[in-house]
């Protein structure tokens, strides 16, 4: 279906039968029918206008919380490139960042500008677009604490803006329709001393390194924390620490992380996650909800 789309009006790179494994931290999964990297917001709008409404659409950022199944994705995948990675320091301690901007870089630029309130982004391995979609958070703060407004494009190619209230944020969720692709966020910070903020970020970095598997093929937090409980504690209590299926393993360091070893498949990872869910439910009666986004064909 995607090969029949008239893409003469778009300027960005279009790749058919594009491998998606390189764009996922797990480094597993199949191909997308089409991968589009828009040149800018106008180019993204032009692509969306010619994309048939019945073609499934997926937007990817760093791929830090993404599991692409082995059969690949039957539809169009959009990856926001350099034009969406800008980070601008504005008056009154505000930051304007493209949806493709890496959370860690936003945190650092804000710190260097003496803007406090963004240190939590140091603990999120993703992009601003993902943080908008999921109300990304870490270390007792989340996106709704700093967002002023977000800008996006809907499936018809129409630019839309949302204030923080209209985002409908709750825990790891935004109520904005899935067909809206976020392109930019305007965020509000507060005055701070660069040295103090950078020290706070350094403490977050040390805490992550000590308690989470970094520099490994993982997908970040696998499951959302249920109310009044921590997912990792429930998983540990169910005896899942180190549990392995095929090339996938529950991290020994932090049980809410799944690790892909050499030879792992997406099926291994998903099967392991489901086995963890089964054991946790059997032990505690709590049904864990996936935080990692699983897409594509088995």
For each predicted feature, which ranges?
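Anion-binding (especially nucleotide phosphate/pyrophosphate-binding) glycine-rich loop
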Residues: 2-128
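Residue-level signal for pocket-adjacent positions within structured domains
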Residues: 15, 21-23, 30, 61-62, ...
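Phosphate/pyrophosphate- and phosphate-bearing ligand-binding catalytic cores of soluble enzymes
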Residues: 15-16, 66, 153-274, 278-298
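Structural signature of FAD isoalloxazine-binding scaffolds in flavoprotein oxidoreductases
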Residues: 29, 36-41, 67-85, 133-163, ...
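A generic local secondary-structure boundary/capping motif
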Residues: 66, 107-110, 118-122, 135-142, ...
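Short, well-ordered alpha-helical segments in soluble proteins
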Residues: 110, 128, 132-136, 151-154, ...
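Short beta-strand or tight-loop elements
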Residues: 116, 146, 165-167
């Amino acid at each position: 279906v995607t090969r029949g789309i008239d893409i003469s009006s778009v300027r960005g790179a279009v790749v058919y039968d594009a491998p998606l494994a390189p764009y996922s931290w797990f480094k597993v999964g199949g191909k997308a029918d089409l991968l589009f990297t828009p040149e800018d917001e106008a180019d993204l709008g032009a692509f969306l206008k010619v994309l048939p409404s019945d073609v499934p659409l997926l937007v990817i950022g760093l791929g830090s919380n993404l599991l692409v199944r082995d059969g690949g994705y039957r539809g169009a995948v959009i990856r926001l490139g350099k034009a969406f990675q800008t980070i601008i320091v504005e008056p009154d301690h505000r930051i304007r960042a493209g949806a493709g901007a890496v959370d860690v870089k936003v945190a650092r630029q804000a710190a260097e500008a003496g803007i406090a309130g963004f240190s939590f982004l140091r603990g999120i391995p993703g992009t601003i677009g993902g943080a908008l979609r999921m109300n990304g958070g870490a270390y007792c703060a989340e996106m709704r604490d700093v967002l002023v407004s977000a800008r996006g494009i809907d499936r018809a190619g129409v630019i839309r803006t949302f204030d923080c209230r209209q985002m409908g944020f709750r825990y790891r969720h935004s109520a904005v329709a899935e067909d809206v692709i976020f392109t930019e966020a305007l965020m509000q910070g507060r005055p701070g001393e660069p040295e103090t903020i950078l020290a706070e970020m350094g403490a977050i970095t040390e805490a992550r390194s000590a308690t989470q598997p970094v520099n490994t093929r993982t997908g970040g937090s696998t499951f959302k924390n249920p109310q009044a409980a921590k997912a990792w504690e429930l998983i540990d209590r169910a005896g899942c620490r180190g549990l392995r299926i095929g090339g996938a393993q529950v991290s020994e360091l932090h049980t809410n992380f799944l690790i892909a070893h050499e030879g792992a498949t997406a099926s291994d990872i998903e099967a392991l996650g489901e086995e963890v869910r089964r054991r946790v439910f059997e032990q505690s009666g709590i049904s864990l909800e996936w935080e990692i986004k699983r897409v594509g064909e088995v």
